[in-house]
Regions:
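C-terminal subdomain of alpha/beta-hydrolase-fold enzymes, centered on the catalytic histidine
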Residues: 1-84
Length: 84
């Protein structure tokens, strides 16, 4: 099983890369965080999704509707990243 996480606005590894990876894997899921950038695993509910995946390794039962409610990442951030 494979869990692929992408941020909709990630300039480094855009969602299209995740889509390409998804096409070559069976038993996988690609979740895209709306209005998110790079490194989304620790933002909002992605931490729980990742934890649930590691616990169950079942991509078909992951509760992922929470990603629709993530706050937008600020356009300008300092060198430490956006505020939590």
């Amino acid at each position: 099983p494979t869990l692929i996480l992408s941020g909709e606005n990630d300039p480094i590894t855009p969602p299209a890369y995740g889509d390409l990876l998804l096409n070559g894997l069976s038993n996988s899921i690609h979740l895209v965080g709306p209005h998110q950038g790079h490194g989304i695993m620790h933002r909002g509910c992605f931490t729980k999704i990742f934890s649930d995946f590691l616990s169950t390794t079942n991509v078909s039962e992951l509760a992922s509707t929470c990603i629709k409610h993530l706050p937008r990442v600020p356009f300008f951030i300092n060198s430490l990243g956006p505020a939590p």
